[in-house]
Amino acid sequence: MAAHCQVTGAQPGFGHSISHSHRRTKRRWNPNIQKKRYWVPSLRRNVTLNLSAKGIKVIDARGIDAVVNELIARGEKI
């Protein structure tokens, strides 16, 4: 599963882990991506989305129909 939220666009952040002696090693901060399935009444089918925790909250606040219509307008594969 790709570390990318379909609603918010959250992607991994990159940087360094810094030890006590200040040695730097590469690391990445992954977003909290969950695979969620929603019933979309306007499409009359289930839709599976890769969402961050914030993306799930956005759907709870705005509604699945509004978010899916925005994704379709953006050209996102659903």
UniProtKB/Swiss-Prot annotation:
Database matches in InterPro entries: Ribosomal_bL28, Ribosomal_bL28/bL31-like_sf, Ribosomal_bL28_bact-type, Ribosomal_bL28_sf
Molecular function in Gene Ontology: structural constituent of ribosome
Protein keywords: Ribonucleoprotein, Ribosomal protein
Chain coiled-coil ranges: none
Pfam families, A to Z: Ribosomal_L28
GO BP annotation list: translation
Keyword Ribonucleoprotein found: yes
Positions with biased composition (Basic residues): 19-30
Chain residue ranges for the region called Disordered: 1-30
One term under GO cellular component: ribonucleoprotein complex
SUPFAM superfamilies, A to Z: L28p-like (SSF143800)
Gene3D superfamilies, per database record: Ribosomal protein L28/L24
HAMAP family: Ribosomal_bL28 (MF_00373)
Recorded family membership: Belongs to the bacterial ribosomal protein bL28 family.
NCBIfam families assigned: L28
Protein name: Large ribosomal subunit protein bL28
Organism per entry: Kocuria rhizophila (strain ATCC 9341 / DSM 348 / NBRC 103217 / DC2201)
